[in-house]
């Protein structure tokens, strides 16, 4: 099975499709600074918003479809005008990036999201993060639509890549941890959240990176496959998750820890090789992702949201 092509990346996924807002998106600029301003006008980070979030905003982080984000934003204020904090949609880096992808793809620009860790928010900490990449005609240009250029000493619209770069892909992070050259305890959401940092956290982010590369831009709290068998997930929702997963027939929960490690190794090596231009590796990755039902999301996933919402989500019916 071939890897996604530039044509595929220039077309909308179900997640990035702006739906009835397509006409408005076709009028927006694809200039990187304009993308930043638009994304950060529509979406405020749910953690940065903190106690100031309204009751309506507190359910926003579970909006996985761009149409839902835009519908909510438009109900609160016109999309083409200024908006107050309370009129923004609460989301995260994934949503800022999805907005940018939506604009770029509407204009036929190949674009994709990348999952990994940012070194530029807290010294010594690799914060889980989502950024974008756009094709400029010759190469993939990495950018962070969440960042204001004046606050950073690197080009946020054409970010450095490779060893020592400010954004570490999940694949690179995993391979560094496996090689013993990176401290797994320094990767995740927060060092104060034991279930949301460390080796296992990076491991399932490799799975997210593969999914997003193949245009399945799910929420960072949508879980499937071997993620369903981890102790953190099994203990969620008062221990009810195992029953939910079994009743929903979701595959992969019985994958052993050792097998999950080996699968993550293979996926990470293929991701890194594909990034380096190895088309065979990219095709092999795509085939592995599509053919192994444990590695890609099916019609249903388990959602364990930071809002406290926990349920089996039917992606087919939205």
Residue ranges and their predicted role:
Residues 258, 268-318:
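Substrate/cofactor-recognition hotspot
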Residues 2-87, 99:
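Secondary-structure boundary elements
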Residues 21-24, 32, 113, 131-136:
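Functionally constrained cores in energy, signaling, and assembly domains
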Residues 86-115, 132:
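Cysteine-centered nucleophilic/redox motifs
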Residues 2-13, 36-56, 117-130, 134-280:
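His-Asp-centered catalytic microenvironments across diverse enzyme cores
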Residues 29, 33, 60-63, 83, ...:
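Low-complexity, intrinsically disordered regions enriched in charged/polar residues
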């Amino acid at each position: 099975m071939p890897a996604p092509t530039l044509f595929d990346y220039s077309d909308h996924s179900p997640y990035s499709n702006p739906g009835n807002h397509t006409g408005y998106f076709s009028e927006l600029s694809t200039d990187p600074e304009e993308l930043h301003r638009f994304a950060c006008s529509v979406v405020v980070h749910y953690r940065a918003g903190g106690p100031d979030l309204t009751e309506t905003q507190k359910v926003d982080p579970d909006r996985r479809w761009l149409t839902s984000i835009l519908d909510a934003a438009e109900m609160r204020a016109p999309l083409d005008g200024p908006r107050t904090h309370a009129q923004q949609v609460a989301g995260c880096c994934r949503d800022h990036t999805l907005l940018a992808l939506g604009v770029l793809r509407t204009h036929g620009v190949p674009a994709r999201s990348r999952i990994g860790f940012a070194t530029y928010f807290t010294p010594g900490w690799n914060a889980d993060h989502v950024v974008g990449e756009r094709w400029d005609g010759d190469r993939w240009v990495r950018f962070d639509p969440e960042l204001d250029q004046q606050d950073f000493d690197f080009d946020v619209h054409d970010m450095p890549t490779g060893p020592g770069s400010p954004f570490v892909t999940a694949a690179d992070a995993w391979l560094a941890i496996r090689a013993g050259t990176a401290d797994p305890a320094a990767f995740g959401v927060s060092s104060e959240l034991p279930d949301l940092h460390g080796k296992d956290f990076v491991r399932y982010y490799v799975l997210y990176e593969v999914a997003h590369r193949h245009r399945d831009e799910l929420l960072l709290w949508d879980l499937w496959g071997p993620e369903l068998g981890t102790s953190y997930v099994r203990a969620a929702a008062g221990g009810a998750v195992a029953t939910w997963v079994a009743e929903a027939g979701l595959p992969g929960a019985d994958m052993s820890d050792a097998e999950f490690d080996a699968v993550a190794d293979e996926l990470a090596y293929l991701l890194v090789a594909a990034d380096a231009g190895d088309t065979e590796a990219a095709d092999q990755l795509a085939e592995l992702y599509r053919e192994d039902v444990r590695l890609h999301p099916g019609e249903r996933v388990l959602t364990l949201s930071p809002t406290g919402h926990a349920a089996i989500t039917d992606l087919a019916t939205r």
